[in-house]
Amino acid sequence: MKISDFMLEYEKFCPKELAVEGDPVGLQVGNPNDELTKVLVTLDIREQTVAEAKALGVNLIIAKHPLIFRPLSALTSMNDQEKLVLDLARAGIAVYTSHTNIDVVTGGLNDYFSQLLGMTDIEVLDDEEGLGRVGNIELTELSVLTEKVKASFGLDRLRLITYDHNLTQKIGRIAICGGSGGKLWPKALEKKADIYITGDIYYHVGHDMLSAGLLGIDPGHYIEHAFIRLVADKLRSFDMGVKIYESQEKTNPFYDI
């Protein structure tokens, strides 16, 4: 089986056309005509995941976050990104990126997050780009919801966006968007969410949300590591006789102390 055959099968589930405009998805490094040996699924491509791929003998990495987000003007090993690209090319390891298309697609990452939180009557948060989800839950105290979010995403801590620290208030409708979805908070308000869950919420955005009457939970960007299990399981379901590995390397740059 060639890498191109594998890509074709994956794109039946998660078409590249679903990606947000300008988002680099698809094959970024490597020859699609190479024979496929083994696959590693990871959130990020960093030095440790490249080393992991080499040790496992894979020749295709499927990553959530693009290795090349902006066009490269040179390949000189003068910065970390160029070094990674050259290292992968020399090792014969191809890179395929599935970024916002896995967020948008039905059965993708945002649907998975919604299921983890027990949301019902789920709809799309941003109707224009397809990002995020909104849904209902049984009326739940904020304190209980925060614990559920931590348990669902394997977190020790999270940031709660509220002024009064009232953890007894009831939540019945949730908006959620994996990654960095701060700009979509007005959409959550429009769809009558009581609380918006997303990563990388800026200080002033938090003020704006609260002034508009919208609570928030920032669980961090790294909850997207759920991509690894979700996509690996999907690839295994294709039953194409290719070994699929889930990356064991931690690529979260933040460490809570």
UniProtKB/Swiss-Prot annotation:
A divalent metal cation 2 binds at residues 65, 221, 224. Keywords: Metal-binding. Gene3D superfamilies: NIF3 (NGG1p interacting factor 3)-like. One of its GO terms (molecular function) is metal ion binding. InterPro entries: DUF34/NIF3, DUF34/NIF3_sf. A divalent metal cation 1 binds at residues 103, 224. GO terms for cellular component: cytoplasm. Pfam families: DUF34_NIF3. PANTHER family: GTP CYCLOHYDROLASE 1 TYPE 2 HOMOLOG, NGG1 INTERACTING FACTOR 3. Homohexamer. Belongs to the GTP cyclohydrolase I type 2/NIF3 family. This is GTP cyclohydrolase 1 type 2 homolog. The gene is ykiD.
